[in-house]
């Protein structure tokens, strides 16, 4: 396992954690300091972990992605609304990796969907990041046991979990062995009763966080979403103010997607399959590439896939009911 502070050391000698924080987590302010110019510079860390020379810029020329990552590295509570495709995940992944490298702490990322968790872990591994894992129903019992052991041994620095995991006693015990450096809520609109994807267990997570930090300073909280109306944002702010007594540094980006073109084509329900077939022929027959067709139900996905296969298209359906 990696060298991380044992729980008894943190509880018996709290000054140790404070001293480590002063040494490794607080910039000294000297330009000539090699450590600070590397460990506290988001651009340097972006290059180290993801191989990019600069952060993505918004249509107004700013880089909210950079600003969000910097706030996370500084240990601030962050509420970020960044459009889909705007590099939202780097806003919390980069500080998480930086945090793990600096002090060995664990970042918990709460995510609502198993597929999203798997995609993030696969993406990090593809970037040669080996300290990321997910706890989800896609794991076998031996795989789950392996992840829990790695959490306790300090081998994992970025852990993605569903909110339901906070009710699991084995998981709770494993977390007690580690110092949690930040709690991140991806798809944070799931916290709001005004959101279409409200998940009650998202609200329970903050209760667990309060219990976890009962005898120690509260770790930073981050809330990230691509779609949040004003009433949803108000709900998120109120929830964390009421349960944890915190306020956020906010980064509210534009929802404008200049790289996308939208077209609305009215048609009858009975015409949708033929219309889908026609759109595919119009756009894919003469050029390479693929298409994603969204439907409103699992049955609809399976039936449309069967129809398109019958028309000669290489097509597969995907939904949450598929086995691992």
Describe the residue ranges of each PLM region.
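Charged, low-complexity intrinsically disordered regions
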Residues: 1-13
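Conserved Rossmann-like nucleotide-cofactor binding loop
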Residues: 115
């Amino acid at each position: 396992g990696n060298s991380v502070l044992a729980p008894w050391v943190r509880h018996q000698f709290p000054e140790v954690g404070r001293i480590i924080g002063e040494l490794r987590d607080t910039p000294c302010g000297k330009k000539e300091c090699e450590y600070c110019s590397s460990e506290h510079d988001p651009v340097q860390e972006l290059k180290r972990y993801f191989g990019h020379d600069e952060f993505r810029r918004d249509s107004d020329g700013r880089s909210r992605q950079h600003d969000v990552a910097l706030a996370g590295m500084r240990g601030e509570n962050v509420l970020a609304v960044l459009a889909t495709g705007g590099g939202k995940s780097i806003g919390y992944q980069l500080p998480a990796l930086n945090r793990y490298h600096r002090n060995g702490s664990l970042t918990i990322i709460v995510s609502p969907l198993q597929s999203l968790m798997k995609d993030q872990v696969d993406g990090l591994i593809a970037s040669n990041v080996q300290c990321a894992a997910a706890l989800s129903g896609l794991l076998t019992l031996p795989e789950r046991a392996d992840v829990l052991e790695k959490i306790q041994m300090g081998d994992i620095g970025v852990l993605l979990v569903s909110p339901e995991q906070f009710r699991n006693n084995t998981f709770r015990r494993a977390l007690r062995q580690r110092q949690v450096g930040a709690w991140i809520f991806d798809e944070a609109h799931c916290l709001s009763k005004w959101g279409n994807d409200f998940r009650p267990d998202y609200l329970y997570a903050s209760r667990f966080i309060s219990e976890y930090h009962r005898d120690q300073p509260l770790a930073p909280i981050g809330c990230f979403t691509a779609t949040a109306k004003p009433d949803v944002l108000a709900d998120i702010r109120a929830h964390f103010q009421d349960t944890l007594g915190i306020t956020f540094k906010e980064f509210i980006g534009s929802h404008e997607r200049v790289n996308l073109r939208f077209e609305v084509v009215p048609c009858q329900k009975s015409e949708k399959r033929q219309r889908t077939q026609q759109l595919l022929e119009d756009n894919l027959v003469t050029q390479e590439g693929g298409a994603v067709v969204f439907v409103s139900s699992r049955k609809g996905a399976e039936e449309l896939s069967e129809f398109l296969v019958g028309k000669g298209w290489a097509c597969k359906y995907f939904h949450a009911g598929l086995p691992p």
